[in-house]
Curated annotation (Swiss-Prot):
GO terms for cellular component: ribonucleoprotein complex; ribosome. It comes from the Bacteria. It holds the Pfam family Ribosomal_L34. GO terms for molecular function: structural constituent of ribosome. InterPro entries: Ribosomal_bL34, Ribosomal_bL34_CS. The keyword Acyltransferase does not apply. Belongs to the bacterial ribosomal protein bL34 family. The gene is rpmH. GO terms for biological process: translation. This is Large ribosomal subunit protein bL34. NCBIfam families: rpmH_bact. PROSITE patterns: RIBOSOMAL_L34. The keyword Ribonucleoprotein applies. Keywords: Ribonucleoprotein, Ribosomal protein.
């Protein structure tokens, strides 16, 4: 059986990247929550 996680940098950036997070209100909320928490990395 094939493993479920098949890494791809392109797909990773397109689905979880900073610019994608900035596009929607919910994504911006995620970034603000991570800023408030003091995360070192906001997005991948």
């Amino acid at each position: 059986m094939k493993r479920t996680y098949q890494p791809s940098v392109t797909r990773r950036k397109r689905t979880h990247g900073f610019r994608v997070r900035m596009k929607t209100r919910g994504g911006r909320a995620v970034l603000n929550a991570r800023r408030a928490k003091g995360r070192k990395r906001l997005a991948i």
